[in-house]
């Protein structure tokens, strides 16, 4: 046989093999509460007809879980198929060194011949570097500011760089995804569509909010509007698949990244300029919220559809995890995976009824000061030294702690959880003590104690020893959030009563929506005020990614007072560490 015929047959064989692989789409929502799917029938005001249709065409998981009650770690687990604590990605402020060494499901599928594309929120490093994690195409719009992209709204190639926002971010991601489906309809593709909804800021256009008239909290109306945009986006994606004859060739996952942040009080604070607070979504009937390993924190909307392969109209009763996405995708794409590389399981044989046992013997979590295990209907939850045991078959709302009635069950689950946590990096049931916010959450949701008073406006008390000037500083989960006063400038945070022998090393990890110059200023013992010379500047870029700055304070005496300045705008701080420099 002539050499060129051999090559041709090889190419045709590879093309046929690739064409037989299913398309895979993962749709990920942001701070989306368990209740907010119309098909659940929990809340009467939510309207999600396209998501309801997706659920009816496939499976709604009664017990679907994310890997963490917070954005960054849950996304790290989803993308790698490995519990994120194995590579030291425990919270929003964690360094990404471990994640950057992991192989994502996008890389695995790209190596198997898939065209891969990412849309929306990334939150796992600089958006311009998303292609390094296996995505050929990037359209990372998650707000109304400029965003990195290497494709247009129409799915055409462009050089990677900032692109102006021309449409609402949820609409833009859906339209770009539909364009990529049209472009690659003849070959397998993997799409990761991560809508930044209904996460704050609650920026739904009026046209979406108008679908929800009547009396309700404005934050609720805005969240429902954002979810309506998500629902329309899902409708556009599924209709594009149908138009191109791809519905039965496409496996779709729809999952929330964690529960809704209620902030206990569900305060209907003004939307303008507020990128925190209650996002308007609800976790009913689950107890707890984002920032907890209670059910309300990580028991999430979870749908799977693959018409013609997975029987539709199912409600699947056994627990499943977002970790299962990578394992399922790899199996369906024919990707070989080394034993132990993935923590999830291939769900398809379970959803087809070929295997009737539960996919998991147990599911386990560790997040900051909390850890939990679910085995069957038993769930053990730990927060610091507190421990709770629930029978979720009769108490999904986690209202009745059975630890004292069933000490043998609690001990058995604790032993399993302890052994599993010893495998993580770093090991241990907890990474530190419970913060005041988490203690308030546990007191209110799990102990039934009265809710703490809502924060006064403005908050002038010290937060972890820090105060804001010309702004408001509050603690949300493990992060300090700084909101400048309206119309004012010169906002900074400050801490006094220090006793740090110089020189001093300052390490701050932050993110901000503003670009410009930041600085650390210091006052030494004996100085009556901050001297102009005692100021160390650094550059700041607007980004939703965490930025780290290490600043040397060349003090010769004792530093007693510091200030941290960033460009004017809202900012978040995960780390503010000042200590004597090593000598």
Region locations from a protein language model:
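Sec-dependent signal peptide recognition
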Residues: 1-7
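Short carbohydrate-recognition loop motifs
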Residues: 471-489
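Extracellular carbohydrate-recognition regions
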Residues: 440-472, 477
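Extracellular ligand-binding interfaces
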Residues: 484-558, 566-569
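Formylglycine-dependent sulfatase
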Residues: 2, 18-387, 394-415, 419-422, ...
């Amino acid at each position: 046989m002539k050499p060129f015929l051999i090559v041709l047959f090889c190419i045709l064989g590879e093309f046929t093999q690739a064409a037989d692989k299913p398309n895979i789409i993962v749709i990920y929502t942001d701070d989306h509460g368990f209740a907010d799917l119309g098909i659940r029938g929990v809340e009467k005001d939510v309207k999600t007809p396209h998501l309801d249709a997706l659920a009816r065409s496939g499976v709604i998981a009664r017990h679907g879980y994310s890997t963490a009650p917070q954005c960054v770690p849950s996304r790290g687990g989803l993308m790698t198929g490995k519990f994120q604590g194995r590579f030291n990605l425990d919270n929003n402020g964690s360094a990404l060194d471990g994640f950057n060494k992991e192989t994502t499901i996008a890389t695995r599928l790209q190596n198997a011949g898939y065209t891969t594309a990412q849309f929306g929120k990334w939150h796992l490093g600089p958006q311009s570097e998303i292609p390094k994690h296996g995505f050929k195409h990037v359209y990372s719009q998650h707000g109304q500011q400029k965003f990195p992209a290497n494709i247009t709204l129409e799915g055409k190639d462009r050089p990677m760089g900032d692109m102006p926002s021309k449409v609402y971010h949820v609409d833009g991601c859906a339209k770009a995804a539909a364009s990529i489906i049209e472009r690659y309809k003849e070959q397998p593709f993997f799409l990761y569509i991560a809508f930044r909804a209904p996460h704050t800021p609650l920026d739904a256009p009026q046209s979406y909010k108008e679908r929800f008239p009547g009396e309700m909290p404005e934050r609720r109306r805005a969240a429902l509007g954002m979810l309506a945009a998500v629902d329309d986006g899902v409708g556009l994606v599924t209709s594009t698949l149908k138009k191109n004859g791809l519905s039965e060739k496409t496996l779709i996952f729809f999952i929330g990244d964690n529960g809704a942040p209620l902030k206990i009080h569900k305060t209907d604070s003004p939307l303008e300029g507020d990128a925190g607070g209650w996002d308007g979504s609800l976790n009913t009937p689950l107890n707890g919220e984002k920032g907890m390993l209670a059910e309300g924190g990580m028991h999430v909307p979870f749908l799977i559809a693959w018409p013609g392969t997975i029987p539709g109209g199912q409600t699947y009763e056994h627990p499943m995890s977002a970790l299962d996405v990578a394992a399922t995708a790899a199996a369906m794409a024919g990707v070989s995976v080394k034993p132990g590389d993935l923590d999830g399981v291939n769900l398809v044989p379970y959803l087809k009824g070929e295997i009737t046992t539960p996919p998991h013997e147990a599911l386990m979590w560790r997040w900051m000061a909390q850890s939990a295990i679910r085995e069957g209907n038993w769930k053990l939850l730990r927060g610091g030294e507190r421990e709770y045991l629930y029978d979720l078959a009769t108490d999904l709302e986690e209202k009745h702690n059975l630890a004292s009635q069933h000490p043998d069950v609690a001990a058995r689950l604790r032993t399993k959880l302890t052994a599993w946590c010893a495998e993580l990096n770093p090991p241990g049931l907890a990474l530190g003590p419970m913060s005041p916010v988490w203690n308030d959450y546990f007191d209110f949701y799990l102990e039934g104690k009265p809710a703490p008073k809502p924060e006064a406006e403005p908050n002038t008390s010290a937060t972890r020893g820090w105060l804001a000037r010309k702004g408001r500083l509050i603690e949300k989960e493990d992060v300090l959030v700084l909101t400048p006063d309206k119309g004012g400038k010169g906002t900074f945070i400050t801490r006094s009563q220090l006793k740090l022998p110089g020189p001093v090393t300052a390490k701050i990890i932050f993110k901000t929506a503003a670009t410009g110059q930041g600085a650390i200023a210091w006052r030494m013992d004996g100085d009556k005020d901050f001297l102009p010379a005692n100021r160390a500047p650094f550059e700041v870029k607007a980004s939703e990614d965490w930025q780290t700055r290490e600043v040397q304070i060349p003090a010769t005496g004792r530093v007693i007072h510091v200030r941290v300045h960033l460009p004017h705008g809202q900012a978040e701080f995960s780390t503010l560490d000042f200590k004597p420099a090593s000598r």
